[in-house]
Amino acid sequence: MTYSSDKADENALRVSMAYITAKGDIITKSGDTSSAENSDLYGMNAALLVTHGGHGAFTDAKISSTGNGATGAYGYSKGTYINLTNAQVSTTGAQAAGVEVSQRAMMKVEASTVTTTGDQSPAIRISQN
């Protein structure tokens, strides 16, 4: 499957209170956030957002984003879990982390490549845990 969004403050794929298992999916996001704070704290504008106890297992996924505040994969809130295996994550833009978790979400990144280009855009960011 391919998921994409070019709208500001929107996720290409959002998993909330649900479970998803996917192989070979392509997730792309372009566009700047209207609020760097909301992007950093809640995953607004991320390509992939898993939230509110959702679980996402992605194998061989290609996740890319272009834009300020456009994080690649973001997990938010207690009980949320993301598993990325053999994934390729790339972001271009300021404040666009490769992968990020906050509010006690958990993420496992295994045998994957995470690359970022932009100011304040670490490959991995953990906040408010």
Positions of PLM-derived features:
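Extracellular beta-strand/beta-solenoid scaffold signature
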Residues: K7-R14, S35-L49, G67-Y76, T92-V101, ...
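Beta-rich extracellular carbohydrate-active architectures
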Residues: T2-S5, I26-D32, I63-S65, Q88-T91, ...
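A cross-taxa feature marking solvent-exposed loop/turn segments within ectodomains of secreted
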Residues: D6, I20, G56, T66-N68, ...
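Extracellular beta-helix/beta-solenoid repeat scaffolds
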Residues: T2-E37, N45, G56
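A short, hydrophobic secondary-structure junction motif
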Residues: M44-K62
